[in-house]
Amino acid sequence: ASRSQAEDVRVEGAFPVTMLPGDGVGPELMAAVGVIECLKLGDGLFLQCCEEVAELYPKNIANPTATLLASCMMLDHLKTSDMGGYATCQDFTEAVIGALSHP
């Protein structure tokens, strides 16, 4: 059976882009790394793959790199028309606000 784009997880970061089966394995494998962001292309879900951040938050030592990189990927994915996309400025802003409102 062939996999659709919706079943793939695109992984970027310190390593070359890797396509993984959409079985949830990718985020678990990279959770230990803490600075890898990934994007599930099928539904536009952006993950920061750093589960340990919740444990480190009270100590004020959590590394925000993965969260920032995932945010950059989201902004790149939500292209406005001047960047080759179809979103208006308002569409783009509302999408970002919506994502911030629903972590």
Curated annotation (Swiss-Prot):
GO terms for molecular function: enzyme activator activity. Keywords: Mitochondrion, Tricarboxylic acid cycle. The heterotetramer and the heterodimer composed of IDH3A and IDH3G subunits can be allosterically activated by citrate (CIT) or/and ADP, and the two activators can act independently or synergistically. The heterodimer composed of IDH3A and IDH3B subunits cannot be allosterically regulated and the allosteric regulation of the heterotetramer is through the IDH3G subunit and not the IDH3B subunit. One of its GO terms (cellular component) is mitochondrion. It is found in: Mitochondrion. PANTHER family: DECARBOXYLATING DEHYDROGENASES-ISOCITRATE, ISOPROPYLMALATE, TARTRATE, ISOCITRATE DEHYDROGENASE [NAD] SUBUNIT, MITOCHONDRIAL. SUPFAM superfamilies: Isocitrate/Isopropylmalate dehydrogenase-like. It comes from Sus scrofa (Pig). This is Isocitrate dehydrogenase [NAD] subunit beta, mitochondrial. Belongs to the isocitrate and isopropylmalate dehydrogenases family. One of its GO terms (biological process) is tricarboxylic acid cycle. The lineage of its organism: Eukaryota, Metazoa, Chordata, Craniata, Vertebrata. Plays a structural role to facilitate the assembly and ensure the full activity of the enzyme catalyzing the decarboxylation of isocitrate (ICT) into alpha-ketoglutarate. The heterodimer composed of the alpha (IDH3A) and beta (IDH3B) subunits and the heterodimer composed of the alpha (IDH3A) and gamma (IDH3G) subunits, have considerable basal activity but the full activity of the heterotetramer (containing two subunits of IDH3A, one of IDH3B and one of IDH3G) requires the assembly and cooperative function of both heterodimers. Heterooligomer of subunits alpha (IDH3A), beta (IDH3B), and gamma (IDH3G) in the apparent ratio of 2:1:1. The heterodimer containing one IDH3A and one IDH3B subunit and the heterodimer containing one IDH3A and one IDH3G subunit assemble into a heterotetramer (which contains two subunits of IDH3A, one of IDH3B and one of IDH3G) and further into the heterooctamer. Its main location: mitochondrion. It comes from the Eukaryota.
